[in-house]
């Protein structure tokens, strides 16, 4: 592994452990020339998974596309990068275990929406506003009503749990 500082081609592994997602190995390395320490990640090469887009075209599954959409939706929200990474890992794991060779972009979008609904309501609404391509204000109001009902249901369950 080349050193990111001096570009020397030899480094030694100082520490190695499984990352939080369980599918990645995190390694701390040290350059044998300049002694700079840096981190690398190793993961199993996945078989290509194709995403069938709404227009029928196919493209390779991209974890980064999902990550970028979620990061944009979570801007200026109290959502940590660790939370986002965990959401993306769960989505990718569900996609890879549920679908063999191809998955529709709609199925991926629905998985993202499900995860964001649990993570942060505002992030969910922001993502939905782009993903769902609302035609008018009534559709947005309907989504907000669904979220409000779900939040009220959660609060009601919490209150019932506290009184029992």
Swiss-Prot record:
Alphabetical list of PROSITE patterns matching this protein: ATP_CONE
InterPro entries assigned: ATP-cone_dom, NrdR-like_N, RNR_NrdR-like
Cofactor comment text: Binds 1 zinc ion.
Pfam families per UniProt: ATP-cone, Zn_ribbon_NrdR
Role played: Negatively regulates transcription of bacterial ribonucleotide reductase nrd genes and operons by binding to NrdR-boxes.
Keyword Transcription listed: yes
GO MF annotation, one: ATP binding
Domain of life: Bacteria
Cofactor: Zn(2+)
Native species: Streptococcus pyogenes serotype M6 (strain ATCC BAA-946 / MGAS10394)
UniProt record similarity statement: Belongs to the NrdR family.
Listed NCBIfam families: transcriptional regulator NrdR
Gene: nrdR
GO biological process, one term: negative regulation of DNA-templated transcription
Protein name: Transcriptional repressor NrdR
Chain ranges of zinc fingers (unnamed): 3-34
Domain ATP-cone: 49-139
Keywords: ATP-binding, DNA-binding, Metal-binding, Nucleotide-binding, Repressor, Transcription, Transcription regulation, Zinc, Zinc-finger
